[in-house]
C-alpha cells in the first residue's frame, strides 16, 4: 500500500479512491482519466489488491503530454515510460489497460457500453470546457449504482465544468467533499444525494450537496 509514495505526482483523493475500492465489485470496470506517472493508479490498484478484488479492470486514459498551466514547468517527455515502469506488474497481469489518447476520442468512448463502468475518475485537463466534456461524455457510461468523481473542485473551472456537464443530463446537484483540494462525486442512484453525504472516510473531511 505504500509503493505509490515513491511515484512523483499530485494525489489528494485517497478518500475518493478508497470509496471506489470499497463499493466496486470484483470483475467490474473502472476508468481513470489522467494518470500522470501513475501515483494515483498505483494507490488504486494496491487498494483493490488488498481488498481481494483481483479481477477489476482499470482503464487509464492519458495523452502523457500534460495539459494547462499545472504541467507548464514539468518535463513530461519520459512520463509514459515512467508510468509503464511504475505499474508494470499490474499491466503484465492485464489489470490495467492503457489508452494513450484523449478522453474525448470517439473510438475510446464507443468501446465502453452505456451503463457499463462502475467508477469514472476525472482528473485530466482542468479547463472548464474539458471538464464539462468529460463529465458529459462519460456520465452515460456509469452503471446504475456507480460513481463519478473528479479532483480539484476548488478550482472554479472544474466546479463549473462539472455542473455544466451534469446539467446537460438533467442533473442539478453534486456532492463536494472538502479536503485539501476538494473533489466532487456523483452517484448514479435515485438516492444519490443521500448516499453522497456518506462519502466521508478521513476525520475532518466533510461532504455536502451543492447545486449547480
Residues covered by each model-derived region:
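S-adenosylmethionine/decaboxylated-SAM
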Residues: 2-212
Amino acid at each position: 500500500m505504500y509503493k505509490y509514495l515513491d511515484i512523483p505526482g499530485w494525489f489528494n483523493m485517497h478518500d475518493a479512491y478508497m470509496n471506489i475500492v470499497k463499493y466496486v465489485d470484483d470483475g467490474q470496470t473502472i476508468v481513470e482519466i489522467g494518470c500522470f506517472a501513475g501515483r494515483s493508479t498505483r494507490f488504486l490498484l494496491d487498494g483493490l489488491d488488498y481488498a481481494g478484488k483481483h479481477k477489476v479492470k482499470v482503464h487509464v486514459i492519458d495523452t502523457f503530454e500534460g495539459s494547462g498551466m499545472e504541467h507548464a514547468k514539468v518535463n513530461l517527455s519520459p512520463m509514459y515510460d515512467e508510468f509503464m515502469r511504475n505499474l508494470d506488474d499490474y499491466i503484465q497481469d492485464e489489470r490495467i489497460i492503457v489508452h494513450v489518447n484523449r478522453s474525448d476520442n470517439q473510438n475510446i468512448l464507443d468501446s465502453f457500453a452505456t451503463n457499463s463502468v462502475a467508477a469514472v475518475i476525472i482528473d485530466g485537463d482542468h479547463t472548464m470546457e474539458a471538464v464539462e466534456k468529460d463529465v458529459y461524455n462519460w456520465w452515460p457510461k456509469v452503471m446504475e449504482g456507480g460513481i463519478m468523481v473528479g479532483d480539484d473542485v476548488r478550482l472554479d473551472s472544474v466546479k463549473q465544468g462539472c455542473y455544466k456537464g451534469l446539467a446537460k443530463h438533467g442533473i442539478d446537484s453534486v456532492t463536494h467533499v472538502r479536503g485539501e483540494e476538494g473533489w466532487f462525486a456523483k452517484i448514479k442512484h435515485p438516492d444519490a444525494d443521500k448516499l453522497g453525504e456518506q462519502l466521508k472516510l478521513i476525520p475532518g473531511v466533510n461532504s455536502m450537496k451543492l447545486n449547480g
